């Protein structure tokens, strides 16, 4: 996917001050309920979950549900399983078309975390802000829908329905569904001591989009202008937007090639939160230890200049449509990282070995002084495509 021109509201006959991100007070997957609160809220759903499964198919086929990236439900016939996920987010970038692509990629990412590469069907869930003027609604929402549709088509699937409602905030999400044979998905519970942890997208998207908005807020920009330039911020923002819109489909396919033992995608709970959640699901007594944090260039410095208000160094900074965190056999991990960069997968993208799986008590932690890997922006060397539907 090529870099796009910056979204210009006036090209769509909108006021130049229009910002999509102003139609929600929370950003991206920063809307997630905290993990500990979520677990308490879902306790009543979990009580009878596995009892029903045992009555249905016993332990013949794997089942996954409450609290994980997707649900895996054994079907009554044919040895098949239904794999399904739903997700939604609030606007995190001001380009409506890219926001649609990001929302779609974010939904699909939960399937990809299971090693599923084919999605049979998608539904789109839209909340149209009742604070939008008629003109804003009629110009912006079709761009969002087109972005969502284009990302679905890139994933080899289609949008066949959904639900659209009025809401105080703009809400973007969907449902992704597929029917799989057991060898088409990878249960996220087989990590063993000696595995390594691989991450397929850099961290820091939430920081990048936040500081990009600070360019228009002098009192906030003044706090960080000594550690980052406006050009640095623009590049980080473009890189974050492209990363969020990029599908994790290639990584999902390579999970099979290189014998992945478990995976999750990194979104609203931050890398540590999702690593902890994945560690809890393991059948073996293991723990995850993270030594390296790949971060969008200059965003670690920005985070430190802000007193680490984003939680980036602690692993609690939310990501939107982040990468996959994959447990791979040590001997396979370097080959995975080399393969995902191959031009045969389009532009080719980096992945990083960030930690290890060791014998433990199903916890995850980041070491006291993790190595920060500054990830240079790829967008600087790419062609710029015009925004679709804009008038000159």
Swiss-Prot record:
Gene3D superfamilies: PurM-like C-terminal domain, PurM-like, N-terminal domain. This is Selenide, water dikinase 1. Belongs to the selenophosphate synthase 1 family. Class II subfamily. The lineage of its organism: Eukaryota, Metazoa, Chordata, Craniata, Vertebrata. Its main location: membrane. Its cofactor is Mg(2+). Keywords: ATP-binding, Cell membrane, Kinase, Magnesium, Membrane, Metal-binding, Nucleotide-binding, Nucleus, Selenium, Transferase. NCBIfam families: selD (TIGR00476). Its EC number is 2.7.9.3. It catalyses: hydrogenselenide + ATP + H2O = selenophosphate + AMP + phosphate + 2 H(+). The active site is at 31. It is found in: Cell membrane; Nucleus membrane. The record marks 32 as: Important for catalytic activity. ATP binds at residues 32, 67-69, 87, 110, 161-164. It comes from Xenopus tropicalis. Synthesizes selenophosphate from selenide and ATP.
């Amino acid at each position: 996917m090529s870099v796009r021109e910056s979204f210009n509201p006036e090209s769509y006959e909108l006021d130049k001050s229009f910002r999509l991100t102003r139609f929600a007070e929370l950003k991206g997957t920063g809307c997630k309920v905290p993990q500990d609160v979520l677990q308490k809220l879902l306790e009543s759903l979990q009580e009878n979950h596995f009892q029903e499964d045992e009555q249905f198919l016993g332990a013949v086929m794997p089942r996954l549900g409450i609290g994980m990236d997707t649900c895996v439900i054994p079907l009554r016939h044919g040895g098949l399983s239904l794999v399904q996920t739903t997700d939604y987010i609030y606007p995190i970038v001001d380009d409506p078309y890219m926001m649609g692509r990001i929302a779609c990629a974010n939904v699909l990412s939960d399937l990809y975390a299971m090693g599923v590469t084919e999605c049979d069907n998608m539904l789109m869930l839209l909340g149209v802000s009742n604070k939008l003027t008629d003109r804003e609604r009629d110009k912006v929402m079709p761009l969002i829908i087109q972005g969502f549709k284009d990302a679905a088509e890139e994933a080899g699937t289609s949008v066949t329905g959904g639900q659209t409602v009025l809401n105080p905030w703009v809400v973007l999400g969907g449902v992704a569904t597929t029917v799989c044979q057991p060898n088409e998905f990878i249960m996220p519970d087989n990590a063993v001591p000696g595995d390594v942890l691989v991450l397929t997208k850099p961290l820091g998207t939430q920081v990048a989009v936040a500081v990009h908005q600070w360019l228009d807020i002098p009192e906030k920009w003044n706090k960080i202008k000594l550690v980052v330039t406006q050009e640095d911020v623009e590049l980080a923002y473009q890189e974050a937007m492209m990363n969020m819109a990029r599908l994790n489909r290639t990584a999902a396919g390579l999970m099979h090639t290189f014998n992945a033992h478990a995976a999750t995608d990194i979104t609203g709970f931050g890398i540590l939160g999702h690593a902890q959640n994945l560690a809890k699901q393991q059948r073996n007594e293991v723990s995850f230890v993270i030594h390296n944090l790949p971060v969008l260039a200059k965003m670690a410095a920005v985070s430190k200049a802000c007193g680490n208000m984003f939680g980036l160094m602690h692993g609690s900074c939310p990501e939107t449509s982040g990468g996959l965190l994959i447990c791979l056999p040590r001997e396979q991990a370097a080959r995975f990282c080399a393969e995902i960069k191959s031009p045969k997968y389009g532009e080719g993208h980096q992945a990083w070995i960030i930690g290890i799986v060791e014998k433990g008590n199903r916890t995850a932690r980041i070491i006291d002084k993790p190595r920060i890997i500054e990830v240079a922006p790829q967008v600087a060397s790419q062609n710029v495509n015009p925004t679709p539907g804009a008038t000159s």
